[in-house]
Design a protein with these regions (language model features):
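Class I SAM-dependent methyltransferase Rossmann-like catalytic core
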Residues: 10-27
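Conserved alpha-helix/loop element of class I SAM-dependent methyltransferases that forms part
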Residues: 23-42
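Class I SAM-dependent methyltransferase SAM/SAH-binding core
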Residues: 47, 55-104
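A short acidic, Gly/Pro-enriched loop at the edge of an enzyme's catalytic core
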Residues: 103-114
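A short SAM/SAH-binding and catalytic strip from SAM-dependent methyltransferases
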Residues: 114-127
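A short glycine-rich, Lys/Arg-flanked "PGG" loop and its adjoining helix->strand segment in the class I
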Residues: 128-142
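Short, glycine-/aromatic-enriched active-site segment of Class I SAM-dependent methyltransferases
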Residues: 148-166
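Conserved Class I S-adenosyl-L-methionine
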Residues: 190-252
Length: 252
């Protein structure tokens, strides 16, 4: 879809607004990534990039009660959702919410102990993200991104079509090579579980998709956008063995 088209953008967010999270992931994956990261400083400074409505932000705040978290996203309604949820959870005083562009970050070098980015590094390019964000980490800081990867060679054309918007998508070994080439030590990695996709993302998304379809019936632009979202869900349901998100935990 074309986010520059106001009608398509409105239809997309008619489904995605008020979601608990904006991509595959869950608390269990946050716990595992933090385990791989190992001990952090006593009061770590964390940057959560493309935080969306903040499902993982709140998990980080809960699991790291002494952390100071900067949560950045380019879509203001998601940030309002995060603010409300953080206030309800009693952690708003430890989260700085920033409306900004992860491709143009305003932070000084060595500002953070941990940079987190679930499901969004590919938007600016995985290599670009690895290079740009490294300078923001303090010595022995950790970068924890998730990156879409092929899990099997030679995926069918129908599966590749699902990811046509990301032609640079590679396999697990390639993602590791890119990280090593940028001078990171790989502390560990793992592929997100099916529950991280279905239970915590596509399940809520399908519920909202049904409601939006009834509300937007008769609007051809909206119906095309909803069909694209539905196709994404169906692709994952049909071909989960061919692709996934790799959660990498990298030491600078």
């Amino acid at each position: 879809m074309d986010f520059a088209d106001p009608a398509q953008r409105a239809a997309f967010f008619a489904v995605h607004n008020d979601m608990p999270r904006e991509g595959p992931g869950d608390r269990a994956s946050v716990v595992e990534a933090l385990r791989l990261a190992g001990p952090l400083p006593a009061r770590p400074d964390i940057l959560d990039l493309a935080c969306g409505p903040g499902g993982q932000t709140l998990d980080l705040a809960d699991l790291l009660p002494d952390a100071r978290i900067t949560a950045l996203d380019g879509y203001a309604p998601f940030l309002r959702d995060l603010e409300a949820r953080a206030r309800k959870a009693g952690v708003l005083d430890r989260i700085s919410i920033v409306h900004g562009d992860m491709a143009r970050l305003p932070y000084a070098p060595q500002s953070f102990d941990l940079i987190w980015c679930e499901g969004a590094a590919y938007i600016i390019g995985f290599d670009t993200a690895l290079a740009a964000w490294k300078s923001l980490l303090r010595p022995r800081g950790v970068l924890a991104p998730t990156e879409p990867v092929w899990l099997k060679p030679d995926p069918p054309a129908s599966v590749r079509a699902c990811w046509a918007a990301y032609p640079a998508m590679e396999d697990v070994a390639s993602a590791r090579r890119h990280a090593a080439a940028h001078g990171y030590d790989i502390l560990g990695d793992f592929v997100l579980s099916d529950a991280a996709w279905q239970t915590h993302y596509y399940g809520p998304l399908e519920t909202r998709l049904g409601a939006a379809a009834a509300r937007l019936a008769g609007d051809p632009v909206a119906e095309a956008v909803l069909a694209e979202i539905r196709g994404e869900i169906e692709c994952r349901r049909a071909y989960p063995e061919y692709y996934g998100y790799l959660f990498l935990v990298l030491r600078a």
